[in-house]
């Protein structure tokens, strides 16, 4: 592993441990040339995924881009970063285990919306507004109508 401070390849792992959900291994490293300490994360990648964009272009799947788009949707929302990371891992696992090496951006968007809907309604609407390219207020009203009709269908817990 190359040192991010001096670019030396002479680094050593000082500590290695799994994260809470055991999906990622956290490694604490030290550069032998400059003594700079840094952390890396290692996760299993089942297969190389390619995203087919709406214009037909093919690009490698970028987990970090998914994280950034979710963080934008969840900005100033009361959702713990651990829950976001768990959701991202679940989405990536679902994509990788789908059997296809190439996945359309539409499918990825639908899967993300499914996960966001169960996590945070406001983030869901924010993501949907970009993903579905909302142009008018009635587009927001339609999504809000979907959410409220789902809420009406949910059983109300009994109070004791």
UniProtKB/Swiss-Prot annotation:
PROSITE patterns: ATP_CONE. Binds 1 zinc ion. The keyword Metal-binding applies. It comes from the Bacteria. GO terms for biological process: negative regulation of DNA-templated transcription. Residues 49-139 form the ATP-cone domain. Residues 1-11 have a biased composition (Polar residues). GO terms for molecular function: ATP binding; DNA binding; zinc ion binding. Transmembrane segments: none annotated. Keywords: ATP-binding, DNA-binding, Metal-binding, Nucleotide-binding, Repressor, Transcription, Transcription regulation, Zinc, Zinc-finger. Its cofactor is Zn(2+). It holds the Pfam family ATP-cone. InterPro entries: ATP-cone_dom, NrdR-like_N, RNR_NrdR-like. Negatively regulates transcription of bacterial ribonucleotide reductase nrd genes and operons by binding to NrdR-boxes. NCBIfam families: transcriptional regulator NrdR. This is Transcriptional repressor NrdR. It comes from Nitrobacter hamburgensis (strain DSM 10229 / NCIMB 13809 / X14).
